[in-house]
Regions:
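Short, structured surface patches at the beginning of a domain
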Residues: 1-114
Length: 114
């Protein structure tokens, strides 16, 4: 996994849980370092996860479309969007641009295999 560039995306749904953004970032950053993955950008936002218009998702799309990342690291699939159809549409964008989405669970398995 070395020499791969990743975008770390963290999201919570309301300000009362904003402290969990730091936890998500720390966990994903530690796993990426263990695997030799280069984190080139981090987005932490409070958003409901119901649309593509958030600042963090727009920034993430920019990195994907401009081929600046190979991986997107997220805590779990619901951190991107809460609706399956939006997650599926986002995955299409990633597939088209050869970007892989990895959750914290995926990363933990990969670190065990190293």
């Amino acid at each position: 996994m070395k020499d791969l560039n990743a975008f770390i995306y963290c999201r919570v749904s309301d300000n009362h849980k904003a402290y969990l953004l730091d936890y998500q970032e720390k966990m994903l950053t530690e796993c990426s370092k263990q695997l030799g993955i280069n984190a080139v950008a981090v987005s932490k936002e409070v958003d409901d996860g119901k649309h593509f218009w958030s600042r963090g998702i727009q920034c993430l799309e920019h990195y994907i479309i401009n081929h600046k990342v190979d991986l997107i690291l997220i805590y779990d699939q619901t951190r991107l969007f809460i609706f399956d159809d939006l997650n599926d549409e986002f995955k299409l964008l990633c597939d088209k641009n050869n970007v892989t989405i990895l959750t914290s669970g995926d990363l933990q398995i990969l670190t065990l295999m190293e």
